């Protein structure tokens, strides 16, 4: 009897130790799983964000090509990259000179820009945005927009917009020649930035406001469907109206609430894009994450802009090319375009400054005396641009043969945790039965 009790006690002790070990492992794994899955809301330092934005600026500035700037789409991409790179603090002196020389090559004697016609919509008003981008670059380059290449570009911009009928600003499927939805916001910021010098500012601004209301719904912008991307490409440029017009504020607040509730995965910290095969399903997306940083930084949502920054730099940063961001694991200049916007917008938000495309801080401020800046170290961030890559990247279904990291919804750790927990429970029950005295 004593031997039986002794053996029972030993077995009890053995099973008890095993159970404790397994329980400890389960707790550790569950903690790890929760840490990996939870959004990282910790705010990075301004220096950290600026370092990342300047790396991406260097990557894009070294690939800048102004040879085909008469194309409206190319003009947009090259102008945006230059503006954001300047805002990041990266030394863009050579790029600024090359850009302005390229613009002069397509400028007529009256200051108008000789832009190529769009093959599908030859009467498109998208070229309005080319003047807007140029004005923003001129401000950042410390050039006099009222006397650039012997032309007053502010007056020219004012006259073009003032002469345009309201319908030119309201894009729709039935009005495809109007200013594209993605161009409306940048025109608005150029108008706001130069409002003191535009004699028809009030009437032009009213046209833009009517257009914004006309293209908006409670979900935001319907352009080939609804998405966070669409909402960022429009509403991130209207913070000025948001703060000065209660009607626009209510409109944008509604859109921001819908955007967060629909496209933000608060469990995994990802920002999602609708699946092309099933619009009710959403997949984590690189560009959406980058643009989320820009949208939430503009509207001072520090928690979500921090999450977007952390997710972007953790999951989508190139492991081989400094400054580049990836699209399905491969370096993509187009994802990097959006990433630079998100990074610089967040950088400026942390600095207490407005959207990077708003140059009112320059055009409406008395400039201090020019002082020499210390030379910035230059680094050779180069990569090969894939010429076949299209700006209109199709979003693949992430559910098909696409490995996911724990932060984007990998459930393997959770499954392991459940299995180990069940094993531990079984051992505890068995141990209890062995040691239970017989009646």
Model-identified regions with their sequence ranges:
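An edge-strand/N-cap motif at the start of beta-rich repeat modules
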Residues: 38-90
């Amino acid at each position: 009897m004593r031997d039986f009790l002794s053996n029972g006690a030993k077995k009890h002790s053995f099973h008890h130790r095993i159970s404790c070990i397994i329980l400890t492992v389960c707790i550790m794994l569950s903690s790890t799983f929760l840490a990996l899955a939870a959004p990282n809301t910790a705010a990075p330092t301004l220096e950290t964000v600026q370092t990342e934005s300047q790396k991406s600026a260097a990557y894009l500035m070294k690939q800048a090509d102004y040879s085909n700037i008469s194309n409206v789409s190319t003009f947009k991409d090259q102008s945006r990259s230059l503006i954001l790179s300047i805002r990041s603090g990266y030394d863009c002196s050579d790029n600024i000179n090359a850009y302005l020389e390229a613009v002069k090559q397509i400028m007529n004697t009256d200051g108008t820009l000789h832009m190529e016609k769009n093959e599908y919509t030859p009467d498109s008003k998208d070229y309005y945005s080319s003047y807007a981008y140029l004005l923003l670059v001129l401000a950042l380059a410390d050039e006099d927009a009222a006397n650039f290449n012997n032309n007053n570009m502010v007056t020219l911009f004012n006259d073009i917009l003032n002469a345009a009928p309201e319908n030119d600003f309201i894009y729709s499927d039935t009005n495809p020649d109007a200013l594209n939805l993605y161009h409306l916001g940048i025109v608005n910021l150029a108008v706001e930035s130069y409002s003191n010098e535009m004699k028809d500012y009030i009437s032009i601004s009213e046209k833009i406001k009517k257009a914004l209301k006309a293209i908006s719904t409670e979900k935001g912008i319907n352009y080939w469907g609804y998405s966070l991307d669409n909402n960022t490409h429009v509403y991130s440029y209207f913070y000025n109206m948001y703060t000065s017009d209660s009607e626009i504020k209510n409109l944008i607040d509604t859109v921001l609430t819908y955007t967060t509730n629909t496209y933000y995965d608060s469990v995994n910290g990802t920002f999602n894009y609708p699946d092309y095969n099933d619009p009710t399903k959403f997949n984590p997306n690189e560009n959406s994450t980058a643009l989320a940083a820009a949208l939430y930084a503009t509207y001072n949502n520090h928690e979500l802009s921090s999450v977007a920054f952390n997710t972007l730099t953790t999951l989508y940063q190139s492991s081989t090319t400094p400054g580049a961001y990836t699209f399905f694991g491969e370096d993509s200049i187009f994802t990097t375009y959006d990433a630079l916007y998100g990074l610089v917008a967040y950088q400026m938000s942390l600095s207490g400054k407005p959207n990077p495309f708003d140059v009112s801080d320059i055009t409406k401020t008395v400039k201090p005396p020019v002082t020499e800046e210390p030379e910035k170290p230059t680094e050779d961030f180069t990569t090969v641009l894939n010429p076949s890559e299209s700006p209109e990247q199709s979003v693949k279904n992430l559910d098909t043969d696409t490995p996911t990291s724990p932060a984007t919804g990998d459930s393997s750790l959770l499954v392991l945790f459940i299995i180990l927990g069940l094993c531990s429970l079984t051992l505890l029950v068995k141990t209890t039965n062995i040691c239970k005295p017989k009646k």
